[in-house]
Curated annotation (Swiss-Prot):
Gene3D superfamilies in UniProt: 2.40.50.1070, Vaccinia Virus protein VP39 (3.40.50.150)
Organism: Aliivibrio salmonicida (strain LFI1238) (Vibrio salmonicida (strain LFI1238))
GO biological process, one term: tRNA methylation
Reactions catalysed: uridine(54) in tRNA + S-adenosyl-L-methionine = 5-methyluridine(54) in tRNA + S-adenosyl-L-homocysteine + H(+); uridine(341) in tmRNA + S-adenosyl-L-methionine = 5-methyluridine(341) in tmRNA + S-adenosyl-L-homocysteine + H(+)
Alphabetical UniProt keywords: Methyltransferase, S-adenosyl-L-methionine, Transferase, tRNA processing
Gene: trmA
GO cellular component: cytosol
Lineage of the species this protein comes from: Bacteria, Pseudomonadati, Pseudomonadota, Gammaproteobacteria, Vibrionales
Stored NCBIfam families: trmA_only
Entry-linked HAMAP family: RNA_methyltr_TrmA
Protein name per the record: tRNA/tmRNA (uracil-C(5))-methyltransferase
C-alpha cells in the first residue's frame, strides 16, 4: 500500500467544511460569529511516531492505514515539521548501518519544537546494553555535528536509557512575549506549535480586562497558566499527572513568573475541596489557602470526555468561564448546563489537526 495523499492545495476547503460543521453544531446556542484560526497547510505537526520495518538488509519507516490496517512506507511525512523530515532519512541510514542499533528496533518517536530542539525515542523488543549505549552516543554526536540539536532515548521493557535529557525546551511567541516550556517525552504537549501560539494569544485577548484571580483545571505543563498570568493577580492551577506538574514548576521558574501556583490533584477532588466537602492534606502541605483566592474567572481544558456534571456545576459558580475543548460533542453537552447561567461571548475554532475530522474549539462565557 502507498502512503495516503494529502494535498495542501485543499487545505482551505477542509477548513471551510470544519467551520460550517462547528457553526451548525452549536447553532442551538446563542453564539457570536465563529473566529477561525488556521494551521500551516503542511509541516505543522510537532511530533510523529513510526513503526520500523525490517526487510533483509533494508530498514524503513512505516505507518498503518486506520481502516484497512495495511502498512505503507513513509520516507517523507508531510504533516510533520521540517525538522522531523530533515532528520528522518539521516537517522534511518545511520541505524541501518549499525547491527547494534537496528537489532529488534520496532518503533521511533520524534518530538520536535519551534525552538529547534528535537528528541528521538527508539523502542526495542530486547534489553539494551552498554554496547547499545556506546553506539547511540556516537549516533547522537554524528547527528549533532550535522546541525541538529538532538537528544536520544532508548526504550525497552521496563528500561529507559537517556542521552542526555528526556525533554525539549520549546519557546512560544505570544504577542510580544517569548514563553519557555519544558516538554517531557511521553507526556502531553500541544501537537501543532503554530496553532498553539494562536490559542494562547486568543486566551490572553479574551481575558485582558480581567480582575482578581484565575483558577485553571487540567493545566498540564502550565501551557495556558503562564501566558494568562499577566492578566490576573494570581493563578491557581490543578493537574493530576506528576510529570506535567513537574514540568509546570520548571516552566514557572524558567519564565520568572511569581503569581502562579500548581496543585497536584484531580478536578473532581478539587471541586470537593472548593465546596468544603472534605479537607485535603495535599493543599495544607503546599500551603494553599483556597479562601485567600478571589477567583472570578475559571479556565478549563478537559480531556475528550469533557467535565462531569459536578464539575460543570462548580464551574457555573464563576463570573467568567474559558473552555478549551478537543471534543465538540462533550463541549456541547457541557454547554447545555453552562449556558443556563452564562452567555457565550467568544467562540473559536483552532485547526490543530488539518485533514482530519478533529476540531479544537474555544468558548468564553460571562454570567448573565
Amino acid at each position: 500500500m502507498t502512503q495516503p495523499v494529502m494535498n495542501p492545495e485543499n487545505y482551505q476547503v477542509q477548513l471551510d467544511e470544519k467551520t460550517e460543521a462547528l457553526s451548525a453544531m452549536f447553532s442551538e446556542f446563542d453564539v457570536p460569529e465563529l473566529e477561525v484560526f488556521s494551521s500551516p497547510a503542511e509541516n505543522y505537526r510537532m511530533r510523529a511516531e513510526f513503526r520500523i520495518w525490517h526487510e533483509g538488509d533494508d530498514m524503513y519507516y512505516v505507518m498503518f492505514d486506520q481502516k484497512t490496517k495495511e502498512k505503507y512506507r513513509v520516507d517523507y511525512f508531510l504533516p510533520a515539521t521540517r525538522l522531523i523530515n530533515d532528520l528522518m532519512p539521516l537517522l534511518a541510514e545511520a541505524i541501518k548501518g549499525s547491527k547494534t542499533l537496528r537489532y529488534k528496533m520496532f518503533q521511533v518517536d520524534f518530538l520536535s519544537t519551534l525552538s529547534g530542539e528535537i528528541l528521538v525515542s527508539m523502542l526495542y523488543h530486547r534489553q539494551l546494553d552498554d554496547a547499545w549505549k556506546e553506539e547511540a552516543a556516537v549516533l547522537k554526536q554524528q547527528l549533532n555535528e550535522k546541525g541538529f540539536n538532538l537528544n536520544l532515548i532508548g526504550r525497552a521493557r521496563k528500561m529507559k536509557i537517556v542521552l542526555d535529557q528526556e525533554f525539549v525546551i520549546e519557546k512560544l511567541k505570544v504577542n510580544d512575549d517569548i514563553l519557555t516550556y519544558k516538554q517531557v517525552e511521553n507526556s502531553f504537549t500541544q501537537p501543532n506549535g503554530v496553532v498553539a501560539q494562536k490559542m494562547l494569544e486568543w486566551a490572553v485577548d479574551c481575558t485582558q480586562d480581567s480582575q482578581g484571580d484565575l483558577l485553571e483545571l487540567y493545566c498540564g505543563n502550565g501551557n495556558f497558566s503562564l501566558a494568562l498570568a499577566k492578566n490576573f493577580d494570581r493563578v491557581l492551577a490543578t493537574e493530576l499527572a506528576k510529570p506535567s506538574v513537574e514540568s509546570a514548576q520548571y516552566n514557572i521558574a524558567a519564565n520568572n513568573i511569581d503569581n502562579v501556583q500548581i496543585v497536584r490533584m484531580s478536578a473532581e477532588d478539587f471541586t470537593d475541596a472548593m465546596e468544603g466537602k472534605r479537607e485535603f492534606r495535599r493543599l495544607k502541605d503546599q500551603n494553599v489557602d483556597l479562601k485567600s483566592y478571589n477567583c472570578n474567572t475559571i479556565f478549563v481544558d478537559p480531556p475528550r470526555s469533557g467535565m462531569d456534571e459536578g464539575t460543570c456545576k462548580m464551574v457555573q459558580g464563576y463570573e467568567r468561564i474559558m473552555y478549551i475543548s478537543c471534543n465538540p460533542d462533550t463541549l456541547k453537552e457541557n454547554l447545555a448546563i453552562l449556558s443556563k447561567t452564562h452567555n457565550i461571548t467568544r467562540f473559536a475554532l483552532f485547526d490543530q489537526f488539518p485533514y482530519t475530522h478533529h476540531m479544537e474549539a474555544g468558548i468564553f462565557l460571562e454570567r448573565k
